[in-house]
Swiss-Prot record:
UniProt cross-references to NCBIfam families, sorted A to Z: ATPsyn_F1gamma (TIGR01146), PRK05621.1-2 (NF004145)
Compartments reported by the entry: Cell membrane
GO biological process annotation, one example: proton motive force-driven plasma membrane ATP synthesis
Organism: Nocardioides sp. (strain ATCC BAA-499 / JS614)
SUPFAM superfamilies the UniProt entry points to: ATP synthase (F1-ATPase), gamma subunit
Protein name as catalogued: ATP synthase gamma chain
Pfam families reported for this sequence: ATP-synt (PF00231)
Similarity-based family: Belongs to the ATPase gamma chain family.
Xref: InterPro entries: ATP_synth_F1_ATPase_gsu (IPR035968), ATP_synth_F1_gsu (IPR000131)
Length: 303
């Protein structure tokens, strides 16, 4: 019984150590979520004004730009999947990968071939384990994305879309990422990025507001050539920021659940250890009483 008691005490000690780690990771994720939300909010004005500028050019000119041109027969699709670099985030990566599988099944049903692009080591490991080809992957920034990373990814996807005869030329570009709705809800989302469908925001001008007349210098084509790539990159950066906040929220929830489970295990092991200790004490008392009775019987027999 003493050996069993030592085992339970060792389990309690190891569980307490694990609880300290998960609690620390929960607090770190909570603090980073606030920063991730602030980054997303600070990037919103730029994205909003950029969308308005692109919408203005598209509305007040009749330019046919390659990034907005619908293909006559779409046959090849690029799919960017945004996962995490690290684990301990619950079902975060598996959920976005399931959404990517659903999208891939839908696209294959339409007779389209898929080129996979990945962000995050979890996506890399998923495809490597299944021996699935990946055109290109990026890692190292899933929880703290930079605009430079979005610029590199966006440039790669734009080049693949504009390339008409290359090995990895595509007719469409889709992005699968996790959208941050709230601390309790993160939603895997799939959106078509290219060809672009520029939509104005929900804000509408007031009835008495005078809408401006635009003049494009040097030309509407030149303005679009500069704005549209930035627009694509800003949307990718938005997806990265949303995914980062979602990853941190998922990690906080997972670590809180692990901490709560550790508390339950500690209570369980403590209760069992106390029962084992009480059983050991009871057995020792019984043995002492039995020994005393046996000694008394022996003395009575000798008399």
């Amino acid at each position: 019984m003493a050996v069993s008691l030592r085992e339970y005490r060792a389990r309690i000690k190891s569980t307490e150590s694990m609880k300290k780690i998960t609690r620390a990771m929960e607090l770190i994720a909570a603090s980073r979520i606030i920063k991730a939300q602030q980054r997303a909010q600070s990037a919103a004005p730029y994205a909003r004004e950029l969308t308005r500028a692109v919408s203005a050019v598209a509305t007040y000119s009749n330019v046919d730009h390659p990034l907005t041109r619908e293909p006559e027969n779409s046959q090849r699709v690029a799919m960017l999947i945004v996962t995490s670099d690290r684990g301990l985030a619950g079902a975060y990566s598996s959920s976005v990968l399931k959404e990517a599988e659903r999208l891939a099944e839908k696209l294959r049903g339409e007779g389209k071939t898929i080129d996979v692009y990945l962000c995050g080591r979890k996506g890399e490991a998923y495809h490597r384990f299944r021996n699935r080809p990946v055109v290109r992957s990026w890692t190292g920034f899933s929880d703290q994305p930079s605009y430079d990373a979005a610029l590199e990814v966006g440039t790669t996807l734009i080049d693949a879309f504009l390339d008409e005869e290359g090995e990895h030329a595509v007719d469409e570009v889709h992005v699968v990422y996790t959208r941050f709705r709230s601390m309790l809800l993160q939603e895997p989302t799939a959106v078509r990025l290219l060809p672009l469908e520029v939509v104005e925001g929900e804000e509408r001008p007031a009835s008495d507001e005078v809408l401006p007349l635009y003049e494009f210098e040097p030309s509407a084509e030149a303005v679009l050539d500069n704005l549209l790539p930035q627009y694509v990159q800003s949307r990718i950066f938005f997806a990265f920021l949303q995914a980062a906040a979602s990853e941190l929220a998922a990690r906080q929830k997972a670590m809180k659940s692990a901490t709560d489970n550790a508390d339950e295990l500690i209570k369980k092991y403590t209760r069992i250890a106390n029962q084992a200790r009480q059983a050991g004490i009871t057995q020792e008392i019984s043995e002492i009483v039995g020994g005393v009775n046996a000694l008394a019987d022996a003395q009575a027999g000798s008399e």
